[in-house]
Amino acid sequence: MIVKPMVRNNICLNAHPQGCKKGVEDQIEYTKKRITAEVKAGAKAPKNVLVLGCSNGYGLASRITAAFGYGAATIGVSFEKAGSETKYGTPGWYNNLAFDEAAKREGL
């Protein structure tokens, strides 16, 4: 399906899967670059993290920081909808897919 922007009153109503993936990858790279010396030296860090509302905003940022900054195992909870033949998925759906793919690659 070709993704065409749907804008109503300056608000974009749909999401582009590749754009969401790129956004998540950028956040992951930013987090990896900013790991402090304390974390690298083995300072106290969370081992398991539950994030409610993990698909966008602070929740996604928290999950990325816990997983890619501290190496914690994460569980994310969110309510998102997948795309279909006639409708696009929610941005959080695509963000969660991108996070899961990146975490799997890193062995998290």
PLM feature segments, named:
Residues I35, K40-F79:
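Canonical Rossmann dinucleotide-binding motif of NAD(H)/NADP(H)-dependent dehydrogenases/reductases
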Residues M1-V51, K81-A82, E101-G107:
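Non-catalytic terminal and boundary segments that flank Rossmann-like NAD(P)-dependent oxidoreductase
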Residues G71-L108:
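Glycine-rich phosphate-binding loop and adjoining beta1-alpha1-beta2 segment
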